């Protein structure tokens, strides 16, 4: 079964559809953007981000759409693209400072933080502050052994680095 974000009647929600085709099933119905759906390695949960609480935050739900649970609660950051590790113990995410973007925006060319937390939402830590944003960790890039993950950062002259470099 595939999970994806789709726009229907001006609302963005998470849907699933059988891989062989068929009828799609709407899993979320909260107002605003629900995006970034990703199954955990055993297909029990779908991780996603949602603006339903006022800021973009990480959420988790059962694969059938039940038990939708907010996993991050940061009042100063918009949290995007939660990626669960293959061993289902850790989650990485990219965070935009409140005020740098609107809650539903995930734009490039911003200073962001990459964070990691335990899969139960505890022990949130900033791993690195970098210049990036859209494209930094849009897809799950954990190593199969759950010990490393890849991300993208870049520099633009005049933004984040001096013009003369």
Model-derived segments and their meaning:
Residues 1-165:
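Sequence signature of WD/YWTD-type beta-propeller architectures
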């Amino acid at each position: 079964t595939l999970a994806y974000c789709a726009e229907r009647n001006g609302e963005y929600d998470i849907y699933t559809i059988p891989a062989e085709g068929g009828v799609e099933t709407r899993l979320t119905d909260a107002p605003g953007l629900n995006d970034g759906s990703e199954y955990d390695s055993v297909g029990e949960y779908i991780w996603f981000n949602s603006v339903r609480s006022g800021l973009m935050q990480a959420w988790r739900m059962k694969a059938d759409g039940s038990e939708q649970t907010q996993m991050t609660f940061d009042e100063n950051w918009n949290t995007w693209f939660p990626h669960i590790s293959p061993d289902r113990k850790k989650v990485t995410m990219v965070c935009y400072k409140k005020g740098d973007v609107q809650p539903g925006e995930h734009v490039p060319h911003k200073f962001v933080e990459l964070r990691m937390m335990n899969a139960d939402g505890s022990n949130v830590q900033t791993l690195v502050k970098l210049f990036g944003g859209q494209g930094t960790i849009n897809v799950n890039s954990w190593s199969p052994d759950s010990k490393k993950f890849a991300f993208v950062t870049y520099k633009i002259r005049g933004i984040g680095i001096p013009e003369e470099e």
